[in-house]
């Protein structure tokens, strides 16, 4: 494995650890006491910025040697995810809201995991990302962690106060 890839994966590992700590200590304790729509809203707003993935298509931001198969897949997957996040925000408090959030989060997670799969198969080297290096090393770990929070909210969300009340009644 080339040394630049070691630094790349080490950067990603540190981001996963740091964002995991932030999520566990600051984000989840705040979200878990909110109603489902209120808990999902800030996470969906964050994901509406996934259009940043288009940076891999901008000449001069990335190396001309960046494999096009990887670049187009990652960029368009992110644009679709950003669009679904915005649609989820618009419909969140409607009858279709939760279903659209499920679609968004399934797509968004699959898109990020697909990029992890596509990168080595397309022959991507970390240096080819140029200025977009921060996307997989800083942003993607945050996005994956927040997808985990979204799934947790969708699967089990009940505000902490309601959980405490139900325990007292039992």
Enumerate the predicted regions with their spans.
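Membrane-water interface at the C-terminal end of transmembrane alpha helices
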Residues: 20-25, 88-92, 142-161
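Membrane-interface helix-boundary motifs at transmembrane edges
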Residues: 28-40, 91-99, 159-160
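Membrane-proximal helix-loop-helix units in multi-pass membrane proteins
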Residues: 53-101
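Juxtamembrane "helix-exit" motif on the non-cytosolic side of transmembrane helices
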Residues: 26-29, 56-65, 117-125
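Hydrophobic transmembrane alpha-helical segments in integral membrane proteins
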Residues: 1-19
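Hydrophobic alpha-helical membrane segments
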Residues: 77, 81, 85, 101-120, ...
